[in-house]
Structures are given as structure tokens and as C-alpha cells.
Amino acid sequence: NKNISKRFKNVQKIQDTFTHCFFNSTQTNEKFSELTSDKEVNSSRYNFFHANYLYSVGKEKEAKIIIEESLKLYPRNLILNQFKIDLQDKKKVILNNNFDCKNISHNIAEFFYILANAMSKQYKFALSNFYLNLGKYLNPNFISFDVLQAENFYMTDQLDKSKTIYERIGKKGSEYYWFASKQIVSILKEENKEEDPLKYLYERYKKISEPNIYQKFDYANFLKNNDEFEKSIKYYTEVLNLIDENNYLYPKVTDGRGVAYERINEWEKAEKDLLNSLKVSPEQAYVLNYLAYSWIEQGINIEKSLQMLKKANQIKKNDGYIIDSIGWALFKLHRHEEAKEYLELAVLLMPSDPVINDHFGDSLWMNDYKIQARYYWNYVLNLKETDQKLRNSVKNKLLFGKNSDL
């Protein structure tokens, strides 16, 4: 297996680099550069170790350069962003992540982390936590161990344990504070307890004295995803006022704001934002789908929408939403036999989605499968996710059938 072979070689490189560092070899800096130069591997973690090494030998300026260059590739990386802030804090004596490659215990702890991470990716969470606990014993003050353990507990529905760890992580620095706040909100939503996730994150966001563009973007996304569309637009706009088209956030922010505008029926603004998002980053399957489907629903640009959706389907194969949109475009073009094939596949991929089942029912009706169409419409009425507007439409079709012009 090529992947296993490559991972093994990477572990060998890490071991070699840490060995040079442990013995204070003159080649240590060169070894770190070799380790982090492989473009096929996410080397953000080892960029941290490289910068941390340079800082430990008094080369703070070089350490900062490594961090800045790495953040261009991995702008949201947690450990690098916190390290950058730690180095800016002149009063800080102890860094938030304690790692010393001249300490054999710390080096061994990192290899236990590599094993733990590999086990977690294979959904072997108990084994992952076993290796993490060994790593934490050898290096108790390295936050990556806590982050992975909290994720493992979350994935195994041990929400209280996960939340307790995130609360501890949140006290370790401003980047960790916001990261932990977002994770705790996810837990609160899962728990369905009295504590309001919206209020919780609002209170946490308010405590950040000068939110950066990423924190503003995260908060805007959270508001949009919780149907607070007008509020989200305010924060998306704040981000857009601080960045240009070259910033990697630009297509994400214009997409997010475009969706929010569409949801409050400000279509011209929505369309402009979605087009701007695609202008900068044309390979976004879900943005292509959102814009095309919106056009189809308005009865405009349907042929163009179909081409966009076929492109989206090439980028993101077997996605139920995209396949449904292709079927719906064909339906609107009165290509009913083709539409039925796509909509049938969409239902197989997303059997509990009310809109997709409704579309398939319409398609069956237009292909003269009237009994089967009624079966699917009745099924839509029995789905608890079906909103009132769709319920009314389906009830009308059950009484009078599907009008070919609709």
C-alpha cells in the first residue's frame, strides 16, 4: 500500500529530525526544512516544531518567519496561530504548548500522538485514547493531545467528558478560547439542554476584544446556520471590508452572505455575491448548485443552470442535492424521462429529504406513473422535516394532480 509506505517514510523523517534536535546537531534546522518541504503532506504541525526549535535556540526572528510562511498555507491552523500570539506577548515566559526536542519524553510523546491520530482516523477511539494517555503522561502540557482526546470523546457520544476538556483548552490562549467555544456550542446543540447555543456563542464572542477576520467569519457562519440571516450579513460584510479577492476567505464569505441574502429574499444582492464567489473560485460544487437551483426555481437561466450543475456533478460525484438539481432542471425543460432517472437516483441517495421526494413524485406524475407519484407525495406528508409551505403544495397535488406548467 503506497499510503502506508509513505506514512512510514514520514515517521522515519520525523524520527531522524527529532534525533538531530535531541543531540543538538548542526543539521537540525536543515532536517526540519526537509521534513516540512514535502508538498503532498500537511506539514503544519512540524512547521510548529521547527519554529519552536528555532525559538528555543534564540532565533526568534527566524521562528516568526517560519510561522508566517506556514500560515500562508494553513491560515486556520490552531497551534501555529496560538504560537504566533504567544511570541507577540513579551510578558509570556511559558508558551501554551510545551515541547522540547532535547527532552526524550517529549519526543516519545509525539510518536504516541502520531499513533493516536492514526487510530482516531480509523475510528478506533479507545485505542487512540490509550496512546494519548501515554503521550499526556510523558508531556502533560501539550494541548494537541487534549484536542484529539476531546474529539474522540465527542465522536463516541461522551459529551460531558468532551465538554470538560474543551473548557480546559479554552483557558490556554485566545486562539484556543475561540476554538473551544465553537466545539462546546456543537456539544450544546447535540445535548438539547436548556442552555441556548446562540446565546452561549454570542457571550463568548463578545469577550474577544478585537475579533480577527476568521473569528468574525466563524461567527457569521454560525448565525447563518441558525437562521439569523440579517445578523450574519452584518458580520460577513465586516469581513469583506477587511479583505480583497486574493484572500482565501473571499469566496467563502461571498458564498455565505449570498445564501443569507437569498434566504431574506434580497435576490439581486444574493446573485451578485454568489457570482463573485464563483468568479474567484469557480470549482465550488455547492455554490454552483445553490446558484443554479435558485435560478431554476425562478424559471430563469435553466439551460445555463443545467451546464453548471453537470460541472458540479463532475466535481462532487453522487451528491444527492446536486443530482436532484440536475433532475429538476431537466424537469423544468420538460425532459421528463431524463429527469426521472436523475430524481430516482437522488431519492436513493437521500431517501428522507422532503423536497427531493416531492420532486420525484412530480416526475413520476409527468411520466404517467400516477399511483407511484401519490405514494411519494403521501410519504412527504409523513416526514417531520416537511415545512408547511411544502405540505400545502403536496396536499393540493394529491387532490388535483400535478399541473404540467408548474
Indicate where each model-derived feature is located.
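Feature representing long, continuous alpha-helical segments
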Residues: 268, 289-290, 307, 328, ...
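Hydrophobic/aromatic packing residues within the alpha-helices of TPR/SEL1-like helical repeat arrays
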Residues: 32, 67, 132, 166, ...
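Alpha-helical solenoid repeat scaffolds
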Residues: 1-164, 171, 175-193, 211-228, ...
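Flexible internal linker/loop segments at domain or repeat junctions
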Residues: 97-102, 305-309, 315
